[in-house]
Amino acid sequence: MSRCRERGFTLLEMLLALAIFAALSLSAFQILQGVMRNDEMAQRQVQRLTELQRAFVYLEGDFGQIIPRPPRGDERLFYAARYQRQSADWSISFMRNGWQNPMGILPRSELQRVGYRLRHQQLERLSYVHTDPQAGEEPIVKVLLKDVSAFRLRFFANGMWRDSWNDTTRLPEGIEVSLVVADVGEVSRLFFVTTGEQA
């Protein structure tokens, strides 16, 4: 009499199959986790570069509209100095044109006093409501970029670059802005000043 053996998996075969499945699942999970981490890092980098680009757009818009007009009571057309105006590095201040006032609806000029400074590792844009700020008038502060460890300026005039600007009677012809930004490094940009001589 022949006996029919039952066919099936042995305990050892089942354990081996479970171990292989667990190893494959763990590998797939680690790959997925790595992809998600890389995606998150890429998103952070894109966000940082977008913030950096936005800061340079503000600088370009302001430098492109510089006009040679000092504020009342001050003879300086253009102010740039280190460790002034509560800045941890360079600060800069000037008059710009082109502040939008559609059809003159708002009770203000199209001229605006603006400035930039580095404070608490943040690049800040300073703007004033009045063309000639009153004594004690606080600027409107807009944080353009965070985690900035350096804000450096150089000035171009008469065919050469200068590390400081002491000429109170005219504007530079160009400005180089260098920022040292966390997760990005040092970034420099050159800006052409359209009005290099007083009109």
UniProtKB/Swiss-Prot annotation:
Name the NCBIfam families on file.
Answer: gspJ, IV_pilin_GFxxxE
Transmembrane region(s): 9-29
Q: Which membrane topology describes this protein?
A: Single-pass membrane protein
Gene (UniProt)? pulJ
Task: Using the record's annotations, give every residue carrying the modification N-methylphenylalanine.
Answer: 9
Protein's recorded name: Type II secretion system protein J
**Could you say which protein family the record assigns here?**
Belongs to the GSP J family.
Any one GO CC term of the record = type II protein secretion system complex
Can you state the subunit structure given in the record?
Type II secretion is composed of four main components: the outer membrane complex, the inner membrane complex, the cytoplasmic secretion ATPase and the periplasm-spanning pseudopilus. Interacts with core component PulG.
One Pfam family hit: T2SSJ
| Modifications the protein undergoes after translation, according to the UniProt entry | Cleaved by prepilin peptidase. Methylated by prepilin peptidase at the amino group of the N-terminal phenylalanine once the leader sequence is cleaved by prepilin peptidase.
Tell me the classification of the organism that encodes this protein: Bacteria, Pseudomonadati, Pseudomonadota, Gammaproteobacteria, Enterobacterales
Superkingdom in the source lineage: Bacteria
Its keywords, alphabetically, are: Cell inner membrane, Cell membrane, Membrane, Methylation, Transmembrane, Transmembrane helix
Q: Does the keyword Transmembrane apply?
A: yes
Propeptide positions: the record gives 1-8
- Entries under PANTHER family matching the protein: TYPE II SECRETION SYSTEM PROTEIN J, TYPE II SECRETION SYSTEM PROTEIN J-RELATED
What the record says about disrupting the gene is:
Deletion mutant shows longer pili but their number is reduced.
The answer to whether the entry has keyword tRNA-binding is no
Annotated localization: Cell inner membrane
Q: What does the record list as GO biological process?
A: protein secretion by the type II secretion system
Q: What is its main location?
A: membrane
Tell me the function of this protein: Component of the type II secretion system required for the energy-dependent secretion of extracellular factors such as proteases and toxins from the periplasm. Part of the pseudopilus tip complex that is critical for the recognition and binding of secretion substrates.
Q: Which SUPFAM superfamilies match?
A: Pili subunits (SSF54523)
